C-alpha cells in the first residue's frame, strides 16, 4: 500500500500514541530519580554544620582510615634534598549526620557530593618542602547511605628527604612521607592504616629510580608545644638509582682517562711526546669535570664515591706529569753534566731490573770499540823492529835458530851515479840516502819483517805491510851495482766490514798525509821496484847466533820521518777521541737505561694503584648490596 494512500491516516494515530507513551514513562523515571537525589540532598544538608566533628557524643573519636597510592615518582633532588611524587590520598570516615534509608529515596544507596560541603579531616603532609601541606585540588566525595564517606583526592607532594650520596651513582635512598592531623589530637581523631604498603598498581615506572619497598607504619608522638598525643602514619620509601646512565657517561670515561695516564709511562722517552700526552690527559679531565659538575650531587655533608675517584684521577694525572719531567731529566743526562753515583748504578742497573724481569739490550758499539782498539795498537806498535847495536837482531829462544836472512836489492838497470837512490814500491815513501842509512844503522844488519810481539790482536783479520827501501851503507856496497835494503811497516785491518771500512779510512788518512801518489798496491801485486834481491850470506855461525840471542840488549827504533810521525800522532788523537766518545756514549746509555727502569717502576705502580682505585670504587656498593 502506497504511503499517503487511503489507509495511511488509519495507522498514524496508533504509532504516535505508542511513541508518546514511551517518552512519558522515560521522563517520569528520570524525573523520579532526580527528584529522589534532590530530596535526599535537601534532607541531608538541611541544618548540616560542616565545622563540627561528625560524632554523636563529644567524647567520641573519629576514626579515619588512611591509605596512599603512588602514581609516579617524579624527581629526587639531591641538591635540595627533596622527593617529588604524584600520589592519591585515600581517606575514609563515618559521618552519622549523613545517613538515610535507601527505601525512602527509591533505593539510592550512594551519591557524589562536593567535598567542600562536608566535614573533612585536616590531614596534611608534615615533611612538606613546597608549602602546600594540604590537598589543593578538592574533588567530590563518595557518600554512602550508612554515613561512610570516601574521599581520594590526587596530590603532588614535594617531601623533604635526607639524601645520602656516599655511593653515588650506586646509591639507595630512604625517603619518608609523614601524614597526620594538624589540629586534632588522638582523643579527637585517630588514624587507622588502610594498607600496610603503598599501593603501586597504577605506578608509572621512572627512568632513573626504582621503588624497592614502600611500607606504612602508624606512630604516635608527643610534641614539645602541646601536651596531647598526635597520631601519624609514616610511609617509608626505599628507592634505588638506576646506574646505567652514570656508568656510561661518568665512570667509564674516568677509567679510560686513568688508563691513558698509565700509558704515559709506557711511552719511550726518545719520542718526546710524554709531556704532551700528560698535559692532554689533564686538560681532558678538566673539561670532563666541568661537564659533570651538574651531574654529581653538590652537597658538603658527604663526599660522593665518584667525587673521590675523580679527585684520585686528578692527583694521578698530576703525579704522572711530575714523574715524567723527572724521568726526562734523567734520560737526557750525560757525563759532562752529571756523575752517576755508585748506588744508582747498583740499584737501577743491577738490582731493580732483575726484580722487574728486565733484560738490558746488548752493547751497540762493539764494532766501534774494536776499531778503537785496533787503531790504538796501530799507533802504539813499533813500525821497525828493535835491533841490538853491533849484533844481529835477537829473537826469543823458542824461535828458529836460523833467522831469516835480510834481503838486499841490487838495481839492474840503474847506472852507478853519485848519490843514487832506490825507489820504494809505488813511489809512496822516499828512499833514504846512503848517509842517512849509515847514520841510522851503521853496524846493524837489516832483519826480516816480523809480526808484532805476542798473539794477533782480537778483531784483526789480516795484516798488510808497507815496504820501505833504502840504500845500504857504503861499506856494504857490492861490485856491479848498488845494494838496497828493504824494511816493511805492518798495519792490521779489523774483521768486521764496518770496522774494516773505518780502519781502511784511518790507514788511508795515514798514507795520505805521508805520500803524494796513489794508494799502496795490494800485497799480492808485484813490486814495481826494479831491483833484484838476493840473500846475504850469513857470516855468523849457529853457535854465535844462539849466543847472541841469549844476550839482552836495549831495543832501538829506527827514526821515522816527520810526516809519518805526524800521521801517527793524528791516528793516536783520533783513537783517543773515539775512545772518549765511546765512554761518553756508554754513560749516556746507562742514564737512559736508568730512566727506562724508573719508567717501568712507575708503570707497574700506577697500574696497581689504578686497579685498586677501580676496585675501591665498586667494592663498597657491592658489599652494601647496592650493585
UniProtKB/Swiss-Prot annotation:
Provide the binding site for Ca(2+). Answer: 76, 78
Its primary localisation, in coarse terms, equals membrane
Q: Which cysteines are joined by disulfide bonds?
A: 161-175, 225-226
Any one annotated GO CC term: plasma membrane
Source domain of life: Eukaryota
According to the record, glycans are attached at 57, 107, 174
Q: Where is this region: Disordered?
A: 382-479, 497-559
Which intervals lie on the Cytoplasmic side per UniProt?
A: 331-600
Q: Which residues lie on this side of the membrane: Extracellular?
A: 29-242
Looking up Pfam families in the UniProt record yields:
Neur_chan_LBD, Neur_chan_memb
What molecular function does GO assign, one term?
acetylcholine-gated monoatomic cation-selective channel activity
What this protein catalyses is: Ca(2+)(in) = Ca(2+)(out); K(+)(in) = K(+)(out); Na(+)(in) = Na(+)(out)
Q: Which InterPro entries match?
A: Neur_chan_lig-bd, Neur_chan_lig-bd_sf, Neur_channel, Neuro-gated_channel_TM_sf, Neuro_actylchol_rec, Neurotrans-gated_channel_TM, Neurotransmitter_ion_chnl_CS, Nicotinic_acetylcholine_rcpt
Q: How does it assemble?
A: Neuronal AChR is composed of two different types of subunits: alpha and beta. CHRNA4 forms heteropentameric neuronal acetylcholine receptors with CHRNB2 and CHRNB4, as well as CHRNA5 and CHRNB3 as accesory subunits. Found in two major stoichiometric forms, LS (low agonist sensitivity): (CHRNA4)3:(CHRNB2)2 and HS (high agonist sensitivity): (CHRNA4)2:(CHRNB2)3, the two stoichiometric forms differ in their unitary conductance, calcium permeability, ACh sensitivity and potentiation by divalent cation. Cells produce predominantly an (CHRNA4)3:(CHRNB2)2 nAChR.
Which family does the similarity line name?
Answer: Belongs to the ligand-gated ion channel (TC 1.A.9) family. Acetylcholine receptor (TC 1.A.9.1) subfamily. Alpha-4/CHRNA4 sub-subfamily.
What is the name of the protein in this document? Neuronal acetylcholine receptor subunit alpha-4
Lineage from the top down? Eukaryota, Metazoa, Chordata, Craniata, Vertebrata
Q: Which gene encodes it?
A: CHRNA4
